[in-house]
Amino acid sequence: MASAVISVPTTASRFALLQVDSDSDSDSDVGKPKAAGRGAGKPRSGKSPSGKNSQNNEKKKEKRRRKKEQQQSEANELRSLAFKKIPQKSTAPPSLTLQDLANDLINPANVQQGSKPQENWQEWKQRDEQLTSDLYEADLEKALMLSKLEFEEHKKDADKAETASPKTKTGGKKDRKKNQQGKDKRVTVSLKDFQQEDQLKNKPEREPVNPALRDDKFFNKLEDDVSKIVQRDKRREQYSNSAGQEVNTSSEHEQDVRTEQLKYELEKKDQEIAKLKKTISQWEERYKEVKARNSQLLKMLQQGEMKDKAEILLQVEELLNIKEELSSQVTQLHTALEQERSKVKGLQSEQPKHQGNRKGKKASEGDV
């Protein structure tokens, strides 16, 4: 497989040289005469494969041309990135050099009255910081670019391996079928082969991606990543400086950082207060709802208790009425019983008299 080797040596001017060596053309050129020799050495069979060979050659030529165009576009993009000029702020005067600045610092008497070494030092410091930040961005961009290119190469290798594996499997299956065409035996397929066939059938075909759009997205994403990383590093430095570390910065810068930090803390506190207010309002609404429910339940219970009491009183009144009726009936029955008893006693007292009269009548009848 052809592999692109990209060597990007760096010097003081960010990128001095960019080399793109591709082995694909050389490999393809070396492979041509060998293939031709092999084809010439083989005896021709009865069939004429000229149409298939011409189609295969055309496909190979198109693939090589596309590879060359893609590699050329990548090389152009890399060259444009490599030889892009670094923006520098010309804050220091052109005549002032590091040697002059060192001499002025060592021998302050030689310095002119109108010069201000402190201002020159600040200018040089700003320029140095700008240069270091630019170089850092350039190195970071280069590292990200190389890592992403390496990742793309590995991805291409994996894709080619995936595309090659089903072809070999299908070729082996075709050979098996050809060998077993004359036989009437049943073919036994293992479970793994069956599952792999289903996966290959269900696997969707990947859509071709335009290389120009892919390159544009790649470099735009690279620049965005570099800017994000630089901003994050600057924020970390500002936070560490404001946390109390000894940094040689001006008092105004420290005050600005402190004010920004206080503003950020105030915003956090305001957000917390707003959240607490929301929660308090929600709890108040829930408290009102619960209070209303409790009042309704109390009313319902009171109504139920009153109903129960009224029903009990009615039942008591009914029972009292029944009791009075039963007591009156008992008194009536008692009087009737007494009357019957008196009647029985009167009859018992009159019974011997009647018996004596009956005996006298019987005796008189016997005499007659």
Curated annotation (Swiss-Prot):
It comes from the Eukaryota. GO terms for biological process: signal transduction. Residues 152-162, 194-238, 251-260 have a biased composition (Basic and acidic residues). Residues 33-56 have a biased composition (Low complexity). GO terms for cellular component: Golgi apparatus. Residues 88-100, 109-121, 239-250 have a biased composition (Polar residues). Keywords: Coiled coil, Golgi apparatus. The keyword Coiled coil applies. The keyword Cell membrane does not apply. Residues 170-180 have a biased composition (Basic residues). Residues 52-82, 256-350 form a coiled coil. Residues 18-127, 152-260, 333-368 are annotated as: Disordered. It is found in: Golgi apparatus. May play a role in the regulation of insulin-dependent IRS1 tyrosine phosphorylation in adipocytes. Belongs to the GKAP1 family. This is G kinase-anchoring protein 1.
